[in-house]
């Protein structure tokens, strides 16, 4: 792995840990998970592992953060100028011939090959059923995920 990928992973982890607003946390976790899945794909050249990581981790995190966002008050997100300048400078300093140029070589067709169609459909159905069950359970106990007038 190159230095720029390690630098990006560390930076995204620090942003996730230092953010205080759930939406900012969620967006940094989504970026971190997508970046890690791309790294797994390039290391193993096997797309099902990266796809499973995206579906399982992000599916669970979206459900958890959906509940957390409903609990926290409606406050504005505060963006720090120093942090945004650091982030843009870091993106500028990533070499052009780095990991980001390998993104063009991703073959999406490997994900949907005939061998993995059953597993993909099973994972999608599982995530939809889990989301439905959790949202039904929360509406039964009148949790603050929905506001009833």
From Swiss-Prot:
It is an enzyme of class 7 (translocase). The chain crosses the membrane at residues 23-43, 51-71, 83-103, 114-134. Its EC number is 7.1.1.2. It is found in: Mitochondrion membrane. GO terms for molecular function: NADH dehydrogenase (ubiquinone) activity. GO terms for cellular component: mitochondrial membrane. It is a multi-pass membrane protein. Its main location: mitochondrion. Keywords: Electron transport, Membrane, Mitochondrion, NAD, Respiratory chain, Translocase, Transmembrane, Transmembrane helix, Transport, Ubiquinone. It catalyses: a ubiquinone + NADH + 5 H(+)(in) = a ubiquinol + NAD(+) + 4 H(+)(out). It comes from the Eukaryota. Core subunit of the mitochondrial membrane respiratory chain NADH dehydrogenase (Complex I) that is believed to belong to the minimal assembly required for catalysis. Complex I functions in the transfer of electrons from NADH to the respiratory chain. The immediate electron acceptor for the enzyme is believed to be ubiquinone. Belongs to the complex I subunit 6 family. This is NADH-ubiquinone oxidoreductase chain 6. It comes from Rhipicephalus sanguineus.
